[in-house]
């Protein structure tokens, strides 16, 4: 659909506006914003220019960079003194692995996986979900780590219990704006889950499909660690749009991450990339950065297996303290270095999902966010 321009903008001014926005470059863009058809309306009223953008991925940070980069040129081109931006999101529904049917109320599912435990997969899942929300999307999180459900505690919601409006479906818990569900909400915090693989897989499938997800753009699933039968079964049963594999710089973790990539390839789930967690230790006293687990492993693995390094996240005591307190870093201190790293990760995950995927036009819904 062509961009609407108000009649008081000359043809030359209209062309200049499009050229200025078209020339904006960003690391997450594989096509320019005009080719993407994101510029919907440009209106001039007095000395004020109103610009409406509509984006198919969660991109608040990118939109802010766009505003800073092009505003002066746009004001000059249109003889205006003020720009009012309106950014809306029409998050694309993308093709699911193996053409599986959608989960009701969910556009896209992002599986966060690790080849082994202890690499910080759950902490990445929680902060990624919150960062996607901060980037403009409606987001939920499902704790599929059936034997060690930690998401309720990390979200500060361990004492909450879900309700059922009809004795058949579950209303998700709301925490920090996220819609969340976990087997941990249904049992005591100190109880052990002693289930065989098929029972665990069946329970998680129920949890996914019987939760009343509220028109989510993205559902982040915190997968169980490892690459065994449960993980393989879940990867086959869940209509995943794309997967993120979490690792650390240690050689043994990288070897297990390769197994995770291979597992998703085996079941035809696109791997968006790897997240190298604990990439750098940041001293809480002096801010010194030290690569205590080594360097370069993620880049070498990414090159060898043709995947992207989506982020290299720090090891910092604040991440652990904030999650223990149920107030994740991304919401507690959104402007600090750690939160910004997660926001960049969310931006890359959302855009990479879009570029790798195929849009399902009939399932796109419109949502005004600001």
UniProtKB/Swiss-Prot annotation:
Annotated ATP binding sites: 115-122
Keyword 4Fe-4S: no
Keyword Lipid biosynthesis: no
CDD domains the UniProt entry points to: Mrp_NBP35
Matches recorded under InterPro entries: FSCA_dom_sf, Mrp-like_CS, Mrp/NBP35_ATP-bd, NUBPL-like, P-loop_NTPase, YlxH/NBP35
Keywords: ATP-binding, Hydrolase, Iron, Iron-sulfur, Metal-binding, Nucleotide-binding
SUPFAM superfamilies: Fe-S cluster assembly (FSCA) domain-like, P-loop containing nucleoside triphosphate hydrolases
Biological process per Gene Ontology, one example term: iron-sulfur cluster assembly
Gene Ontology, cellular component aspect: cytosol
GO MF terms, alphabetically ordered: 4 iron, 4 sulfur cluster binding; ATP binding; ATP hydrolysis activity; ATP-dependent FeS chaperone activity; metal ion binding
Family note: Belongs to the Mrp/NBP35 ATP-binding proteins family.
Subunit structure as annotated in this protein's UniProt entry: Homodimer.
Entry function: Binds and transfers iron-sulfur (Fe-S) clusters to target apoproteins. Can hydrolyze ATP.
Protein name according to UniProt: Iron-sulfur cluster carrier protein
Gene this protein is translated from: mrp
């Amino acid at each position: 659909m062509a961009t609407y321009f108000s009649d008081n903008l000359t043809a030359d001014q209209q062309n200049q506006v499009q050229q200025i926005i078209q020339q904006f470059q960003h690391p997450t863009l594989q096509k320019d914003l005009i080719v993407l058809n994101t510029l919907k309306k440009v209106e001039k009223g007095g000395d004020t220019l109103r610009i409406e953008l509509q984006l198919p991925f969660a991109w608040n940070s990118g939109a802010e960079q766009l505003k800073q980069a092009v505003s002066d040129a746009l004001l000059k081109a249109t003889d205006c003194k003020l720009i009012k931006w309106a950014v809306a999101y029409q998050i694309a529904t993308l093709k699911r692995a193996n053409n599986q049917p959608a989960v009701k109320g969910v556009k896209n599912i992002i599986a966060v996986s690790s080849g082994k435990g202890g690499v910080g997969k759950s902490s990445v899942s929680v902060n990624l979900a919150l960062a996607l929300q901060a980037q403009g999307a409606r987001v939920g999180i499902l704790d599929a780590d059936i034997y060690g459900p930690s998401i309720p505690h990390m979200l500060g919601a361990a004492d909450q219990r879900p309700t059922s409006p009809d004795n058949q479906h579950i209303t998700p818990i709301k925490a920090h704006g996220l819609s969340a569900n976990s087997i941990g909400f249904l049992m005591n915090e100190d109880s052990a889950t002693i289930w065989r693989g098929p029972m665990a897989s069946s329970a998680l499938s129920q949890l996914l499909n019987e939760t009343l997800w509220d028109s989510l753009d993205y559902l982040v699933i915190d997968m169980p660690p490892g690459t065994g039968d449960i993980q393989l079964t879940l990867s086959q049963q869940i209509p995943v749009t794309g997967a993120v594999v979490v690792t650390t710089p240690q050689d043994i973790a990288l070897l297990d991450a390769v197994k995770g990539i291979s597992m998703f390839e085996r079941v035809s789930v696109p791997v968006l990339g790897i997240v190298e967690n604990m990439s750098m230790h940041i001293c809480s006293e002096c801010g010194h950065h030290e690569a205590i687990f080594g360097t370069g492993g993620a880049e070498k693995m990414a090159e060898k297996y043709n995947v992207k390094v989506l982020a290299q996240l720090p090891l910092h005591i604040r991440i652990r303290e904030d999650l223990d307190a149920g107030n994740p870093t991304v919401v507690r201190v959104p402007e600090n270095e750690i939160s910004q790293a997660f926001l960049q990760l969310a931006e890359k995950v959302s855009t990479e999902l879009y570029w790798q995927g195929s849009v399902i036009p009939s399932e796109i819904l419109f949502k005004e966010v600001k």
